[in-house]
Amino acid sequence: MPEPGPDAAGTASAQPQPPPPPPPAPKESPFSIKNLLNGDHHRPPPKPQPPPRTLFAPASAAAAAAAAAAAAAKGALEGAAGFALSQVGDLAFPRFEIPAQRFALPAHYLERSPAWWYPYTLTPAGGHLPRPEASEKALLRDSSPASGTDRDSPEPLLKADPDHKELDSKSPDEIILEESDSEESKKEGEAAPGAAGASVGAAAATPGAEDWKKGAESPEKKPACRKKKTRTVFSRSQVFQLESTFDMKRYLSSSERAGLAASLHLTETQVKIWFQNRRNKWKRQLAAELEAANLSHAAAQRIVRVPILYHENSAAEGAAAAAAGAPVPVSQPLLTFPHPVYYSHPVVSSVPLLRPV
């Protein structure tokens, strides 16, 4: 067998060596994108859940089979979805307890009695009166363990609040009168200590009398509270004496006024007021007389005398009649003025209107 020569050894060394094996792949992190996207495949299978507890034992084998089928379906859903449905039941949710009595009121019950379930009702006076007593009674009535027939019957409504019905049936005038009576009783109680108990009782009967009086007091009542002026009636002898004194003196001194009041059995204030009124009347009379005189003088100044003139064609008519042979009457002027006529108005001064022909 021939030995390999040096050329064969050189060719063997010139051949490339095989590549080294690749390094092992790094261990995948559980937080890699692939694991996050396909996390359901690496999740361990869920543990079998015990069957749900039932409040009542199944009555028959069919009920037991139905419960087993429901448990199997629940396990299948948990395996497919990747989470346990029982964990949802362990979450704590807030409980909302709504009393059923607020939603169980029949419709006709609310329609027949709007006064007890609504704390503010319209009164005939036009204002809103709070009804705390009515609302409290309504709550007590709702909370009481009454049967359905008692709740639906309208008889408790008719007997519930007779006081409120009486208050609603009264007119605003009656309410105002009652309040004014209570205010008067309060004033009497303050004035007389012996009647303090009665006034306190009347005030307690109407606690909102003061507030009502502020709102219901009308402007028509205010003028009635003013003191009416008294009118003094003088006798004929007193008027005659006062008139004679006024003719002599328009103004009296304090001593003269005191003496006249003593002689006529009057007060000085009455005499003073009579003289003031008499002077005002006298001034009005003077003003009226002066105005009448001015009007008469102005009317007299405006009068203008207008003479009646003859017609200008009287001469032509006379000539025509003479040509016809008829006797011609001599026409005379209707009015003749020996002196020229002047205006009596002061603006027009000495303007002659007509001179004799």
From Swiss-Prot:
InterPro entries: HD, HD_metazoa, HMX_Homeobox_TF, Homeobox_CS, Homeodomain-like_sf. The modification Phosphoserine is found at residues 153, 180. Keywords: Developmental protein, Differentiation, DNA-binding, Homeobox, Neurogenesis, Nucleus, Phosphoprotein, Transcription, Transcription regulation. This is Homeobox protein HMX3. The lineage of its organism: Eukaryota, Metazoa, Chordata, Craniata, Vertebrata. The gene is HMX3. One of its GO terms (biological process) is maternal process involved in female pregnancy. Transcription factor involved in specification of neuronal cell types and which is required for inner ear and hypothalamus development. Binds to the 5'-CAAGTG-3' core sequence. Controls semicircular canal formation in the inner ear. Also required for hypothalamic/pituitary axis of the CNS. SMART domains: HOX (SM00389). Belongs to the HMX homeobox family. Residues 191-209 have a biased composition (Low complexity). It comes from Homo sapiens. It is found in: Nucleus. PROSITE patterns: HOMEOBOX_1 (PS00027), HOMEOBOX_2 (PS50071). Residues 16-27 have a biased composition (Pro residues).
